[in-house]
């Protein structure tokens, strides 16, 4: 997990809460599909969220909050942290490339 003053990014939070509830990525995806009535989520999508490759949309964050029993605003904050860290990393990469 990345140490920062803003809290955990959404992927780290999802992984931590999933582990606390003894869910696999597959079982989380299945529960999300069941409660949302939308089978557009699978283990690969959950893995992408957890690795920070994708940030779950507000739609999925709402359902993740239901399944993992967490307040929606906490997930929204974690998504904002992930977006901030991603933007900061991209900016640092741009500066590094420009310095060459």
Where do the PLM segments sit?
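Short, charged recognition helix plus adjacent turn
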Residues: 76-100
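DNA major-groove recognition helix of helix-turn-helix/homeodomain DNA-binding modules
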Residues: 57-75, 81
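Short N-terminal micro-motifs specific to bacterial/archaeal maturation
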Residues: 19-20, 37, 55, 66
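Recognition helix of helix-turn-helix/homeodomain-like DNA-binding domains
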Residues: 33-56
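Residue-level preference for nonpolar/small residues embedded in alpha-helices
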Residues: 10, 56-57
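A short, Lys/Arg-rich alpha-helix, primarily the initiator
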Residues: 1-26, 30-31, 62, 71-73
């Amino acid at each position: 997990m990345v140490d920062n003053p803003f809290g955990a990014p959404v992927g780290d939070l999802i992984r931590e809460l999933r582990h606390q509830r003894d869910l696999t990525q597959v079982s989380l995806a299945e529960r999300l599909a069941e409660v949302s009535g939308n089978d557009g989520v699978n283990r690969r999508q959950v893995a992408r969220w957890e690795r920070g490759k994708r940030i779950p949309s507000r739609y999925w964050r709402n359902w993740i909050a239901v399944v993992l029993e967490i307040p929606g605003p906490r997930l929204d904050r974690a998504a904002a942290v992930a977006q901030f860290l991603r933007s900061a990393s991209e900016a640092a990469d741009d500066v590094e490339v420009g310095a060459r």
